Amino acid sequence: MDKNDIENAYSNTIYVSIGDAKYDYSPKVLKTIVGSCVAIAIYSEVDGFGWLSHIMLPKAINHKSNNFKYADYAISKGIELFKIKGYKMSNLTAKLVGGAKIYFASQDSIIPDIGKENVLICRKLLMENNIKIKAESVLGSFGRTVFFNLKDGSLFVKCFDGTQIVL
Protein backbone atom coordinates (compact mmCIF):
# COMPACT_ATOMS: atom_id res chain seq x y z
CA MET A 1 0.00 0.00 0.00
CA ASP A 2 1.57 3.29 -1.06
CA LYS A 3 0.89 6.87 0.04
CA ASN A 4 -1.87 7.36 -2.58
CA ASP A 5 -3.70 4.23 -1.40
CA ILE A 6 -3.61 5.49 2.18
CA GLU A 7 -4.81 8.98 1.20
CA ASN A 8 -7.63 7.50 -0.91
CA ALA A 9 -8.69 5.23 1.94
CA TYR A 10 -8.91 8.17 4.35
CA SER A 11 -10.70 10.44 1.87
CA ASN A 12 -13.26 7.73 1.09
CA THR A 13 -13.99 6.83 4.73
CA ILE A 14 -16.96 8.29 6.58
CA TYR A 15 -17.04 7.79 10.35
CA VAL A 16 -20.38 6.92 11.97
CA SER A 17 -20.51 8.11 15.58
CA ILE A 18 -22.43 6.44 18.38
CA GLY A 19 -26.15 7.11 18.03
CA ASP A 20 -25.80 8.18 14.40
CA ALA A 21 -26.31 6.84 10.88
CA LYS A 22 -24.70 7.64 7.53
CA TYR A 23 -25.34 6.59 3.95
CA ASP A 24 -23.54 6.89 0.64
CA TYR A 25 -22.64 5.12 -2.60
CA SER A 26 -19.61 3.17 -3.77
CA PRO A 27 -16.61 3.74 -3.50
CA LYS A 28 -17.11 5.12 0.02
CA VAL A 29 -16.34 3.18 3.20
CA LEU A 30 -18.45 3.67 6.32
CA LYS A 31 -16.66 3.02 9.63
CA THR A 32 -17.71 2.66 13.26
CA ILE A 33 -16.55 1.06 16.51
CA VAL A 34 -18.94 -0.97 18.69
CA GLY A 35 -18.96 -2.87 21.97
CA SER A 36 -22.42 -3.64 23.35
CA CYS A 37 -23.77 -1.30 20.68
CA VAL A 38 -24.69 -2.75 17.28
CA ALA A 39 -23.64 -1.63 13.81
CA ILE A 40 -26.46 -2.23 11.34
CA ALA A 41 -25.33 -2.26 7.70
CA ILE A 42 -27.98 -2.32 4.98
CA TYR A 43 -26.88 -2.60 1.35
CA SER A 44 -28.23 -2.59 -2.19
CA GLU A 45 -26.13 -4.68 -4.57
CA VAL A 46 -27.90 -3.01 -7.49
CA ASP A 47 -26.02 0.28 -7.23
CA GLY A 48 -23.70 0.12 -4.23
CA PHE A 49 -25.89 2.23 -1.96
CA GLY A 50 -25.35 1.50 1.72
CA TRP A 51 -26.48 2.72 5.13
CA LEU A 52 -24.71 2.18 8.46
CA SER A 53 -26.19 2.92 11.86
CA HIS A 54 -24.55 2.69 15.29
CA ILE A 55 -27.28 1.95 17.84
CA MET A 56 -26.85 1.92 21.63
CA LEU A 57 -30.19 0.74 22.98
CA PRO A 58 -33.04 -1.47 21.76
CA LYS A 59 -36.05 0.84 22.08
CA ALA A 60 -36.87 4.43 22.85
CA ILE A 61 -38.68 4.66 26.18
CA ASN A 62 -41.17 7.06 24.66
CA HIS A 63 -41.94 7.04 20.98
CA LYS A 64 -41.30 10.77 20.73
CA SER A 65 -37.56 10.27 20.77
CA ASN A 66 -35.98 11.15 17.43
CA ASN A 67 -32.65 9.59 18.10
CA PHE A 68 -30.56 7.12 16.13
CA LYS A 69 -29.16 5.64 19.32
CA TYR A 70 -32.33 3.51 19.54
CA ALA A 71 -32.64 0.47 17.26
CA ASP A 72 -36.37 0.90 16.68
CA TYR A 73 -35.99 4.52 15.57
CA ALA A 74 -32.79 4.00 13.55
CA ILE A 75 -34.08 1.00 11.61
CA SER A 76 -37.41 2.70 10.84
CA LYS A 77 -35.56 5.77 9.50
CA GLY A 78 -33.15 3.62 7.49
CA ILE A 79 -36.06 1.76 5.91
CA GLU A 80 -37.81 5.06 5.21
CA LEU A 81 -34.68 6.31 3.41
CA PHE A 82 -34.44 3.21 1.22
CA LYS A 83 -38.17 3.43 0.37
CA ILE A 84 -37.90 7.13 -0.55
CA LYS A 85 -35.03 6.22 -2.88
CA GLY A 86 -37.23 3.56 -4.52
CA TYR A 87 -35.68 0.37 -3.15
CA LYS A 88 -37.68 -2.78 -2.47
CA MET A 89 -36.91 -4.17 0.97
CA SER A 90 -36.71 -7.72 -0.38
CA ASN A 91 -33.76 -6.65 -2.59
CA LEU A 92 -31.69 -5.37 0.34
CA THR A 93 -29.37 -7.28 2.63
CA ALA A 94 -28.27 -6.50 6.16
CA LYS A 95 -25.31 -7.39 8.31
CA LEU A 96 -25.02 -6.98 12.08
CA VAL A 97 -21.88 -6.47 14.16
CA GLY A 98 -21.51 -5.94 17.90
CA GLY A 99 -23.78 -6.66 20.83
CA ALA A 100 -20.94 -7.77 23.09
CA LYS A 101 -21.40 -8.33 26.79
CA ILE A 102 -18.87 -5.76 27.92
CA TYR A 103 -20.15 -5.13 31.43
CA PHE A 104 -19.79 -8.25 33.53
CA ALA A 105 -21.95 -8.71 36.59
CA SER A 106 -22.84 -11.51 38.94
CA GLN A 107 -25.23 -14.21 37.78
CA ASP A 108 -27.97 -12.83 40.06
CA SER A 109 -27.53 -9.31 38.75
CA ILE A 110 -30.51 -7.34 37.55
CA ILE A 111 -28.31 -5.58 35.00
CA PRO A 112 -29.60 -6.65 31.58
CA ASP A 113 -27.35 -7.96 28.82
CA ILE A 114 -27.92 -4.88 26.68
CA GLY A 115 -25.72 -6.19 23.87
CA LYS A 116 -27.86 -9.30 23.44
CA GLU A 117 -31.06 -7.22 23.64
CA ASN A 118 -29.69 -4.93 20.92
CA VAL A 119 -28.96 -7.88 18.62
CA LEU A 120 -32.37 -9.48 19.20
CA ILE A 121 -34.35 -6.31 18.44
CA CYS A 122 -32.29 -5.61 15.30
CA ARG A 123 -32.91 -9.13 14.00
CA LYS A 124 -36.63 -8.85 14.76
CA LEU A 125 -37.10 -5.45 13.10
CA LEU A 126 -35.13 -6.36 9.98
CA MET A 127 -37.03 -9.64 9.52
CA GLU A 128 -40.38 -7.88 10.07
CA ASN A 129 -39.45 -5.53 7.23
CA ASN A 130 -38.42 -8.31 4.83
CA ILE A 131 -34.72 -7.43 4.90
CA LYS A 132 -32.54 -10.54 4.80
CA ILE A 133 -29.73 -10.71 7.35
CA LYS A 134 -26.83 -12.00 5.28
CA ALA A 135 -24.14 -12.18 7.97
CA GLU A 136 -23.36 -11.40 11.60
CA SER A 137 -20.46 -11.04 14.00
CA VAL A 138 -22.32 -10.58 17.26
CA LEU A 139 -22.24 -11.19 21.02
CA GLY A 140 -19.05 -12.37 22.72
CA SER A 141 -17.10 -10.26 25.19
CA PHE A 142 -15.09 -7.94 22.93
CA GLY A 143 -15.61 -4.82 20.87
CA ARG A 144 -15.15 -4.51 17.14
CA THR A 145 -14.13 -1.95 14.53
CA VAL A 146 -16.29 -2.14 11.39
CA PHE A 147 -15.41 -1.01 7.86
CA PHE A 148 -18.41 -1.20 5.47
CA ASN A 149 -17.10 -1.22 1.89
CA LEU A 150 -19.78 0.12 -0.45
CA LYS A 151 -17.98 -1.25 -3.53
CA ASP A 152 -19.20 -4.76 -2.74
CA GLY A 153 -21.16 -4.58 0.53
CA SER A 154 -18.47 -6.40 2.49
CA LEU A 155 -17.71 -5.66 6.12
CA PHE A 156 -14.14 -5.90 7.34
CA VAL A 157 -14.31 -6.47 11.11
CA LYS A 158 -11.32 -6.04 13.41
CA CYS A 159 -12.21 -7.70 16.70
CA PHE A 160 -10.66 -6.48 19.93
CA ASP A 161 -9.72 -10.10 20.71
CA GLY A 162 -7.16 -9.83 17.88
CA THR A 163 -9.10 -11.63 15.15
CA GLN A 164 -10.17 -10.17 11.83
CA ILE A 165 -13.03 -11.35 9.64
CA VAL A 166 -14.75 -10.35 6.43
CA LEU A 167 -18.53 -10.61 6.26
Regions found by a protein language model. Name each.
Residues 1-12, 62, 66-94, 105-138:
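Alpha/propeptide regions of enzymes that mature by internal proteolysis
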Residues 1-32:
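Phosphate-centric recognition/catalysis
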Residues 17-22, 101-106, 141, 145-155:
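Glycine-rich anion-binding loops of enzyme active sites
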Residues 20-31, 36, 44, 116-117, ...:
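N-terminal intrinsically disordered, cationic/polar leader segments
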Residues 25, 44-48, 149-152:
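Short acidic-glycine loop/turn motifs at beta-strand connectors
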Residues 30-85:
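Conserved mixed alpha/beta catalytic, RNA-binding, or beta-rich assembly cores of soluble enzyme
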Residues 95-100:
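Glycine-rich beta-strand-to-loop/alpha-helix junction loops that act as flexible
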Residues 115-167:
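Divalent-metal-activated hydrolytic enzyme cores
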